[in-house]
Amino acid sequence: MSQEFLARILEQKAREVEQMKLEQIQPLRQTYRLAEFLKNHQDCLQVIAEVKKASPSLGDINLDVDIVQQAQTYEENGAVMISVLTDEVFFKGHLDYLREISSQVEIPTLNKDFIIDEKQIIRARNAGATVILLIVAALSEERLKELYDYATELGLEVLVETHNLAELEVAHRLGAEIIGVNNRNLTTFEVDLQTSVDLAPYFEEGRYYISESAIFTGQDAERLAPYFNGILVGTALMQAENVVQRIKELQIDKG
């Protein structure tokens, strides 16, 4: 995802937010806290499993998928959380997907989108999300803090996404409890698991780290397991002929 492409996405989000109605805040869906679960289950590399029909880099991935059935398969086979793409223009997602999945699973759901405004946070919570994504590269540090604080005040957890050391330091200054490392280079659009490995020496005690993107095989997961609490996997699961087998391959025993 080049900076130019990221800018295009953010311009689109700004237009969407401008048209978006401010929803009344609904009760928070009840499930376990992701950070607490990660704290108490550090003997295994946890899998955050994603429902994603398409992406800008790959185009269509799996347009015909039964999203609820896919999410329930994830849940039944030990996923710690379901990530749901809700961006319509670039990822062919929809807020209704989050709403439908959240109503049919008991584990946490993540609203995977480019969040730049409080209205989106309320909308995510009302659709059943218990975790939202905030991307350091998409926000000023001041705006990031405002949105982070607002989300936590609403009882949501936040996955703060980083890609390099400077962004990781921003997440640390923020006090983020759950931090993602995206293996996708925002300048070249290339992906490299080494991104996660290289940032690992800078991780801090008391925080939980998730590696995102470019994770396809058990070997990939084993490479990340010494450093991370979990991995976020989308394409590999959406393309898998045997989803159950694939998710089991990714759940690495760290004991």
From Swiss-Prot:
Matches recorded under SUPFAM superfamilies: Ribulose-phoshate binding barrel (SSF51366)
The protein's enzyme class: lyase
Residues in coiled coil: none
Keywords: Amino-acid biosynthesis, Aromatic amino acid biosynthesis, Decarboxylase, Lyase, Tryptophan biosynthesis
Disulfide bonds: none
Pathway listed: Amino-acid biosynthesis; L-tryptophan biosynthesis; L-tryptophan from chorismate: step 4/5
GO MF term set: indole-3-glycerol-phosphate synthase activity; phosphoribosylanthranilate isomerase activity
UniProt xrefs under InterPro entries: Aldolase_TIM (IPR013785), Indole-3-glycerol_P_synth (IPR045186), Indole-3-glycerol_P_synth_dom (IPR013798), Indole-3-GlycerolPSynthase_CS (IPR001468), RibuloseP-bd_barrel (IPR011060)
Domain of life assignment: Bacteria
Catalysed reaction equations from the record: 1-(2-carboxyphenylamino)-1-deoxy-D-ribulose 5-phosphate + H(+) = (1S,2R)-1-C-(indol-3-yl)glycerol 3-phosphate + CO2 + H2O
EC number(s) on file: 4.1.1.48
GO biological process assignments: L-tryptophan biosynthetic process
Record-linked Pfam families: IGPS
Keyword Transport: no
Record-stated family: Belongs to the TrpC family.
Protein's name according to its UniProt entry: Indole-3-glycerol phosphate synthase
Organism per entry: Streptococcus pneumoniae serotype 2 (strain D39 / NCTC 7466)
